[in-house]
Regions:
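Conserved acidic
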Residues: 1-297
Length: 297
């Protein structure tokens, strides 16, 4: 389902919060944590069935469905799945191989581009420039949007829904683990979770077993070799698609002495007295400007 929903009397049940303020309209009485809604009197959202059911499980709320569009679930085309897996196999086999840096970069770019190709938004407001007023944007009318969508439908070869629902499933899979590890989560991104010591590792292990079973089922159902879902790297280690890997087990490098974050894509760590930063748009060398983590603001 694709839904337009009005939520009322909304309050999160967990320490972490999940509804992005930027994805909501007409917010009344909102309280926020790093751009995510803690509670609100009301707001409207356009969202998938995956996101809708996740919100109902993590927030106390009332709701009214304003619009509802439906389609039948099915697997992606087998040819497309096999192409995705081919890029994943190549990327994994070229990673950390001396002399194959260019090949690795190319395969990684192709692998990542498969998602971007399905969610490129071609329906944009018209940007206008004149010598008197400078730059401005003119919102498209409904008729212009419909015309643009019809034209785009004739040119596009991938469904926009591929990317939308892949994102929804990935977000749901990540956040279902976050709510079980709630008080131990200090940071999470699109594909990773940073945790305090003392968390229950069985939660991650159980999730990984769940993914392994699903992949085995899909491989058998679609008659695709299971090896394509779990290629080996140059060191002979298998990397099954979709599993959480514990970086701490790979050495002290990923066990931080100190960690600080100012929000999504903005954090710094200290290991053995050395500071490293991860900030969108800022080079790693920017860490030289910090004498301590207290300076990271």
């Amino acid at each position: 389902y694709l839904l337009v929903v009005k939520f009322k009397n909304v309050k999160c049940k967990y320490y972490n919060n999940f509804i992005s303020q930027s994805k909501c309209r007409n917010i009344v009485g909102g309280r926020y944590d790093n751009g995510r809604i803690i509670q609100a009197e009301s707001f409207e959202m356009t969202l998938t069935d995956i996101d809708f059911y996740f919100i109902l499980s993590t927030y106390d709320c009332q709701y009214e469905i304003i619009e509802n569009y439906y389609s039948k679930y099915n697997y992606l085309p087998k040819q497309f799945i096999e192409f995705v897996l081919e890029k994943y196999v190549n990327k994994t086999q070229f990673k950390n191989v001396q002399g194959k840096e260019v090949e690795y970069a190319k395969e990684k770019n192709k692998f990542n581009a498969l998602y971007g190709m399905s969610v490129t938004n071609m329906i944009r407001d018209e940007v206008v420039y004149d010598n008197k007023n400078g730059w401005s944007e003119r919102p498209l009318s409904n008729d212009e949007i419909v015309e643009a969508l019809e034209n785009e439908k004739k040119k596009s070869f991938l469904s926009f829904a591929y990317g939308v629902w892949v994102t929804a499933f990935a977000r749901s899979n990540l956040l279902k683990n976050v709510i079980q590890l709630d008080e131990f989560v200090v940071y999470c991104d699109t594909d990773s979770v940073k945790l305090k010591q003392g968390y229950d590792k069985k939660i991650i292990d159980n999730y990984n077993k769940f993914v392994e079973n699903k992949i085995k089922h899909v491989a058998e159902k679609l008659d695709i070799s299971i090896e394509k879902f779990a290629p080996s790297d140059v060191f002979g280690e298998k990397h099954m698609l979709g599993l959480f890997e514990c970086e701490t087990e790979k050495g002290h490098l990923h066990t931080y002495d100190k960690f600080i974050t100012q929000g999504a894509k903005k954090y710094a760590v200290e290991v053995d007295g050395k500071i490293e930063i991860t900030v969108a748009g800022v080079p790693k060398q920017g860490s030289k400007a910090l004498s301590s983590l207290d300076d990271f603001r």
